[in-house]
């Protein structure tokens, strides 16, 4: 890991009363600070993923016997990952200690820390950023202290949006470090499963929810993934007006 102290690297940006960047744009790494044994060996022997659990364990044992150099490399990578994990969990990234830390969770906080007051953040995040326990603290902070200009979800079917895992659902986020007003709303679009759906959808008005509504959806400030049809949005709004069946179930919706 190559450390960077932003005030030292960009003194002209962080000196003065209004410190920080006016705009932050990024696509942070989506990976855990952890090296999985089977994932490591799958990179060197792609056929592992098609094997049963027992077959995979036997093949890995065979590979470990044949390739002591890779066994050493895996051990070294795990040590580095453990150190990185400790840095993340002990850093200024509230909530990241829930489970194995994801790098994107730390980057979310870093974006917020380096952008100026009233500055804008435009980033690409995995769906988990809007629902996982590890991202709850950031969601809560952003909803209560920021202004979401737009959140658009896309399903990366056939890799139409990004050359990456086609099963991913991705959030395109536009957020300002500006306190929400009394009547502030959060605009949500999608999910769009193709370029055609996306181009048609962004021409329409987004679904808008008040900050108060977002706070009341779940106890962990999770964002819903709804069908883009108007009827689905309307039905969701009616369901949210009903008393909760249970407020004690983690991530439970107000239905």
Segments from the language model and where they lie:
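Polynucleotide-recognition surfaces of large bacterial nucleic-acid defense/processing enzymes
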Residues: 1-23, 28-94, 114-116, 149-152, ...
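Phosphate/oxyanion-binding active-site loops and adjacent basic polyanion-contact surfaces
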Residues: 2-6, 96-108
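Alpha-helix N-cap/helix-initiation motif
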Residues: 96-100, 131, 162
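Class I S-adenosyl-L-methionine
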Residues: 107, 131-138
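Phosphate/ATP-binding catalytic cores across multiple sugar-kinase/actin-like superfamilies
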Residues: 107-115
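Short, surface-exposed basic-aromatic patches at helix termini and helix-loop junctions that form
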Residues: 113, 139-145
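Glycine-centered, small-residue-biased loops immediately flanking beta-strands
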Residues: 119
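Conserved short loop/turn motifs at secondary-structure junctions
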Residues: 125-130, 159
